């Protein structure tokens, strides 16, 4: 009954207006009120402020400033092995595995279309059929900047307007083609591991999606697909990003989907649904390495794993299924 009510709200509530209201409020400087909201948020979601460059909540002028807070340089060590791709975001893996022709796993028993995710771009989809995907959910407590898993040359960016459904276990199980329906920004890179797509997916109250090379992509929400391209290689107009470098951010955030070409990478064996991710830790290895490195994600303290799972609707909504 409770789940049915929650699901009904996804279709009834004015998600766009709620998102605009959240974005407006999060960008306002409200002095003591801003600090109070941040303090309550930190307490409720158990945000670890000791990892941030500015642990004093009074130092943030707006809630958005707090939400995209930078971390200290020493808290996310980067695995520098050239054969290793690293996690692009702090969060929880919601799904990962092989792309079966045009099908990507959304939730148990539910798939969505690769081509639909890529806004009907069948040429781009052909690069990833039978490849590998990873879907990472960023909970409210997480660091909301997104980084590069490997070195990459930006070739294409597509803004796809769409719905603003919440992204959690309940909607993944009940909203068909959830990620292919929600607003998103698709970024295609040339890498040493073949083509890679990194997709930033919006959701309810995601006020803004930004990239480091173009700034704010959305809003405004004009309801049309937009496409930009960049040259390859050493061209002076090309955009080159290094492994571990920031590539984008959410202001009130959501989900990152990575797509890799077939036969190019192997995911770290210990990773699974609901694995906690930290930027810079091993995500995958190259299939073309001369010596396969033996790598595992750095073990996290049990209390940190519990806090991450407790903050994630991917876990919380399962409690309501009975």
Swiss-Prot record:
* UniProt-listed InterPro entries: PS_Dcarbxylase (IPR003817), PSD-B (IPR033177), PSD_type1_pro (IPR033178)
Listed GO biological process terms = phosphatidylethanolamine biosynthetic process
Post-translational events: Is synthesized initially as an inactive proenzyme. Formation of the active enzyme involves a self-maturation process in which the active site pyruvoyl group is generated from an internal serine residue via an autocatalytic post-translational modification. Two non-identical subunits are generated from the proenzyme in this reaction, and the pyruvate is formed at the N-terminus of the alpha chain, which is derived from the carboxyl end of the proenzyme.
Listed Basic and acidic residues bias regions: 303-322
Q: How is the cofactor bound?
A: Binds 1 pyruvoyl group covalently per subunit.
Listed under catalytic activity are: a 1,2-diacyl-sn-glycero-3-phospho-L-serine + H(+) = a 1,2-diacyl-sn-glycero-3-phosphoethanolamine + CO2
Q: Which domain of life is it from?
A: Bacteria
Q: Which HAMAP family has this protein been placed in?
A: PS_decarb_PSD_B_type1
The protein's name in its UniProt record = Phosphatidylserine decarboxylase proenzyme
